[in-house]
Amino acid sequence: NNIIHLQDTKEEEQKTLKEHQDDIVKCAEMFFLEYGKYFTEKEKELVVEACRIHDWGKANMIFQGLVSPASVKKSGMSVGQNVQIPHGFLSAVTISKKEFKKLSDLFCEEDYGPFVTAIYHHHDREDIYEGPAIQEYAKKYYLEQISEYLGKDIKKLYCSNQNKLLYRNNSYTPKAVIASDIWEKYLLIKGLLNKFDYTVSAGYEVSEIVPDLQEKKLKKSIEMHLREKELRPAQKFMMEHADENLVVVAPTGSG
């Protein structure tokens, strides 16, 4: 079952999986070039790796039958009306904790849960598939394809990753109490992953219209205009506290 088309060819204006992966990683990297000072190095690497991995599950033949039916038909595989396991679930159980920690010297064990949860739930899907069903599905429709896509032999999935998830989107899994720092890490990864994913899926290259942070033309223009004028008390106060976070209550017309 040839999966090369996922990397090298286009069909019906669909971007290939490899192209989408490269585009979203580039989008993330461009964002961090502009706004990287607001994030730690670990946070940036967690987001970029999540962008790289989150759509691996799309290599499964049921998904490919939807976006590229001609290629699946050419392979000789019959996918019929089989129910598709969400690709985010497959992506999240394709990487082991050991493999995850090898991605960066900055990654540690407590990063793994937020990371795989962000990938697993990067789309909101009902979470009703347990390990045995996922493994059976993968044997039929995914292991061979993801092995070829990644260029390495993947014999099984790490369905025990479901035990590392911060939550499950179903009615029968007990809700756990999550430490705020762990939950915030998950929100950061998932939020930026979705931001960059939606950006490139909409056909854009950059996720933010970059403000004039370098030359600060608007700021300089305002300062030039005010240079010959006497600042009002509120304006003077704001100028003197420009490096602080402020909440100011002032009447209309204060400047």
Predicted regions and their residues:
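Accessory nucleic-acid engagement/destabilization modules that flank
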Residues: 1-216
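N-terminal pre-P-loop "Q-motif" helix
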Residues: 17-21, 224-244
